[in-house]
Design a protein with these regions (language model features):
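Single conserved hydrophobic/aromatic residue that forms the stacking wall/gate
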Residues: 1-14
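Residues that form or flank phosphate/diphosphate-binding pockets in enzymes
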Residues: 5, 72, 163-164
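Compositionally biased, low-complexity repeat tracts
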Residues: 8, 50-53, 173, 189
Length: 237
């Protein structure tokens, strides 16, 4: 049985400097600790497992420690980051940042019928394994084009009603898709979101119509993902 472990995420341009200030036997340099790497060691005498992640679109580290030591580590990180202006951020900020980066949330941007091809995550399926659960189904689905795609969309008109999760994408009076995520992007100064649309509307530049809560029709433009930092330069600082 594993010990319950709280996690803390450090995600700004100074996070490597902050963690380096803490006494640790983990080398946080980019060359030895690449993106999506995992390291185990000690941080300020606290045993820790560290994962280099980028869910919010910046270089970041997720730190897992024994539950009783979580608050102590939190205090140490805030103290080490004080000179850099470190500030905690909450779930709402995280949700906006991950949306700007086009990262999906399983169960929100996916459903029981979703497959890797529909959500543009074919890269996440390893082809090196001789067998894995769901492999045969995925192979069968790849034999024909998908009926829908999860795409990004932009709304330039900030006076438009902001679509909400599960608002419908319409073609005339016909329901052709639905919104899975939507929010205002302070970085882009636009309304951005994710939605399932039919394949013929999945190309960048296509116009889709979303039905809002007040029964108004909102036009949105399909765009390439991610919305922010498409070359992921911010994750390699």
């Amino acid at each position: 049985r594993s010990t319950p472990k709280p996690s803390s995420a450090a995600s700004d341009v100074y996070k490597r400097q902050v963690l380096t200030k803490l006494q640790s036997d983990i080398d946080f340099s980019s060359d030895t600790f690449p993106y999506m790497g995992v390291r185990s060691g000690v941080i300020s005498n606290i045993p820790a497992r560290v994962i280099r992640v980028g869910f919010v679109g910046e270089i970041g580290y997720e730190i897992h420690v024994p539950q009783l030591l979580g608050e102590a580590l939190w205090d140490l990180v805030l103290e080490a980051g004080h000179e850099f202006g470190i500030q905690p951020f909450g779930i709402e900020s995280q949700r906006i940042l991950r949306l700007e980066k086009g990262h999906i949330i399983i169960g929100q941007d996916t459903d029981a019928m979703s497959n890797p091809n529909e959500i543009q995550m074919e890269w996440a399926v390893s082809r090196d394994k001789p067998f894995f659960v769901g492999g045969r189904t995925i192979s069968e689905l790849e034999r024909k084009p998908p009926l829908r795609k999860l795409v990004g969309f932009l709304i330039d008109d900030l006076n438009s009603p902001m679509p909400q999760e599960s608002h419908l994408v319409l073609d005339g009076t016909k329901m052709t898709g639905r919104v899975t995520s939507c929010n205002y992007s302070p970085t882009l100064k636009k309304i951005i979101g994710l939605a399932y649309v039919p394949l013929e509307k999945a190309d960048s530049g296509s116009t889709i119509v979303i039905k809002s809560s007040d029964d108004r029709s909102v036009e949105a433009t399909v765009t390439e993902l991610p919305f922010y930092d498409p070359k992921s330069l911010r994750q390699e600082l």
